[in-house]
Amino acid sequence: MNRSAEIRLAILRDLAHVPAGLLRRDEDIRCRVQLQIVPAPSRAEIETELKELDALRLITGISNKITGEMRWRITDAGQAELSNQ
């Protein structure tokens, strides 16, 4: 598995544990993913994969209009993709 795929899978696994209706902050995702992968991915690597997963509609994000902070959740398509792994 290449590094990008490993990071994407770690993100999907992390978001799969978030209770329905709730969102996970960018910072929380980064911390959890960095603990799962050795060597730990950089912030830029994780941000790139978050954007790619969003473009693929496997996750969806909501931006706070005041702080700019992103919060994420896994989509049904993301759950299905994770089940295929």
Question: Where do the model's predicted regions map?
Answer:
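Alpha-helix C-capping/helix-to-loop hinge sites
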Residues: D14-V18, Q36, T60
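Short alpha-helical segments that sit at the start of domains
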Residues: M1-L23
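Short, amphipathic alpha-helical interaction segments positioned at domain boundaries
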Residues: D76-Q85
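Short amphipathic alpha-helical interaction segments
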Residues: P39-L56
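Minor-groove-contacting beta-hairpin "wing" of winged helix-turn-helix DNA-binding domains
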Residues: I66-I74
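A short, conserved structural fragment
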Residues: D54-N64
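Short acidic, hydrophobic short linear motifs in intrinsically disordered regions
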Residues: G21-Q34
